Structures are given as structure tokens and as C-alpha cells.
Amino acid sequence: MKRFLALVALVATLVGCAKPVEPAQKFDKFNSVVYEMNIRQATEEGTFAAAEKYLPELKAMGVDIVWLMPVSPIGVDGRKGTLGSYYSIIDYKAINPEFGTMDDFKHFLATAHDLGLKVILDWVANHTSRDANWWKEGKTDWYVMDEKTGLPIVEYDWTDIAKLNYKNQDMRAAMLDALKFWIELGVDGYRCDVAMNVPADFWKGAWEEVRKINPEVYLLAEGEEPWLHECGFEATYAWELHHIFNAMAKGGSETKNVAGDGTIKTDAKTVKDLKEYMARDDEKYPAPAMRLMFTSNHDENSWAGTEFERMGDAHKAFAALTFVMPKSQPLIYTGQEIALNRRLQFFEKDSVKELVDLEYGKEYRDFYRALCSFRHANKALAAGENVAPAQFVEGVADSVLAFTRTKEDNTVLCLFNFSVEPVKVTLNEAEAGDYMCACGEAKSFKPGDVVELPAWGFMLLSK
């Protein structure tokens, strides 16, 4: 019986081996990789001009879409910290002077487009700052008011924002006008903050109008509600999946049942839970829906912790999985490509100074470059109308997630060990064949061959 040893993590086998795939002439949103850029923290200067210099590195990494966190001026009333929250906006049509000028933004956008990158803006349609221009202009009926205080209501603990009133048609018209403004400027789409808190009929009508300007506009919703896809969004957040990742990595924590019946409750998750999630997700989100999958983003990094805190030694395996699951649209957050193990401050300046040193964090830069390359090289991994389903490998250990995905003449074989112990995977006739590993090495398997996966190890192959 022939045996194959998979190295501890994909990066151990593919660093320096995989070559970036040349981008197609036409943008393929269904096989794209998103990079969330935190302009404030991405460089020491925290400006568009400084961040623009990093765009060629993102292109070389294999990024397709650059999502910019909000770029508009930030409110002062109720401001959190020194610099405030990006999501507390004064003027939807203006640029935060902290980042530069409108001309600086246009230059950033032009450079991105010259490189073949798409740029989407983080759009906050649910609320403005408490001192926004609309409020100062006396448009109080544009807001949801608190009868007791006579001021706009506060949602959650967001004491620096004012909830907008979507029953007001004038406010809706102004919001649509602002959305169209940036598309006419050349922006390629939006990531919409707390999209599920904005009425469905507004989104549907707005996107119909926006697509008259640019039919190829790309739309990502922060929310998991399936109805968001019916309103025109291509992609939604896979939050539930992310929390399953965290729980699988930590192994869960046990607590006694509060009813006192002696049973134990646990938040631990296993591969079984992951497979059940995949089945639910497939049913809830019919193709061509895409699901944004991630191990970090601005919320998780600042408030829940880095992927190293939450996932420990499992972080690379889960990152790799986001690139190969059905309907996935993988996300990389600022600093992940250099293994940044620090919670970035949200309301203060906290630069990722090492990012511009292209020799720094080379192991992780190459790791993500190889994942992007593998994604782009295999049409079986693309989302879209004819998304290839996962066919699970039979007879594997409970800790193993093993599946193939096939589209036309292209098949990928993905093997993951989600445990702290090494495991052996015996391949069946269905998985036999000649493959190319994501590391660039050729591998041939016969029925009965065994692949050895170390703790949290994985292997990605294609033919």
C-alpha cells in the first residue's frame, strides 16, 4: 500500500512553488478573491496615496476585489476614541480628510483599475453620524426619533450614530443619489454594512437604478438573510460558518445544564457539524448566490481577536477551506498576509507598518498567493449558476473533511484533518488519478493509497 505524507500546512509544501495565474481579460466575480483594506491602518501615513503603492502587491498576490472600509468624513458628536468609527458618517459624498482628497481617491481608483483590480466601497445605509449634514440641515423626519429624548434612536451600543427613517421617501432619494454618485465616479460596487437592517424594497430598487449605470456592479451584503440575494446582492456573509470554525478550533467549552438534570451542554463543533452546515447552506442559498467566507475581518480582529487567538494552530487549515468550499468567496483582511497577530485599535491610529516591507511575512504572503493561484486555476472552485457541489470521500475518520469538486474536465480533491492528532486517509477508486498539488508537485493515487495528514494538516490537489 503506497503512502503519501501531507505536510503540516499547505504553506509548508507550496511556498515558492505555486505561480500566480494570469488574470482573465474579463472580470470573473464568481472566482474572485476579496481583500478588505483598512486605509487608516494599512500604512504609517494612513492615506490613499500611501495605500496606492501597495496595490501592485495585492495584484501579485491574486486579489481581484479591494473592499475599502468607509472613506467618508467621521462625525464628532458622540465620537468614540480620538479618530472615531469609520461607520459614523457625516457626508456620503465626501472624503475623510484623514485619508486625503477626492483627487487622491480618484488616483487610487485609477491605479487599481489599471492593475485590473475592482474597488468597492463600504456603504453605511442604516445610519449616519449624530451630527451628519442631513441632521444639521433640519431633516429630522429623515431619522427614527426617540420620543423621550427628541433625538434619533441609538441602536446597539452605537452611541455615535443616528438611525435613518426609510419611511421617508426624500431620504431614500438622497441615499440613492449618493449611491449613484460613486458608481458614476467609477467605483465598482459596494459592501453594505448591516444590510439586513435596511428595507428589502429599498435595496431592490436602488440596485436596479445603479445597474443602469454599471450593469457589472458587484454587491456584498453584511448579513446572512437569504432575502438579501433576492434584492440584488451577489454575496452575503457566512457568519454561521465562521463561528463553526472558531468552535472547531477551540474544541468547545463544557457547562452544566442549568436545568440541573445532569446533562452537559457544549459549544464544541466537529466535522459532522461542518458537513451539516454545508447541506443547510446549499439549500438556503440557491446558486448563483455567493457566501463571503473568512477567518478574520475588521470586526473579528478588533473585537473578537486575531485568527491566532481564536483558531490557534488551525488557522491555516480554515483559511484554506474558505478558498475551496462550494459558493465561497474568500476574504483576506489587512495584515493577514503577514501573519499580523495583533488586535488593531478601531478608533485610534494603529498602523500595520510592516505591510509595505514586501520581505516581511514572506511565508504568509506566499501562503495566500498560492491559495489565490489555486482558486483561479481551477474552474471547479468557482461559484455561480453551475457551482460544483462537494462530493464527500467515503470511509474517512470523523476528524477528516475530504471532498472532491468537479466541473467539466477539472476536479479538485481537498483533504483536511481538523484535529490535534495525525490521521490517515485512504483514497477510494473515485479519488484515484494523477493530480497536481497546490504546491506544484505532481502526485498519482491508486485505490487504497493512504495520505497521512498531521494535526490540522491539509492537502489541495487538482486534475
Which residues make up each language-model segment?
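Active-site-proximal helices and loops of the catalytic beta/alpha 8
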Residues: D193-A287, R291, L321-V324, A339-F374, ...
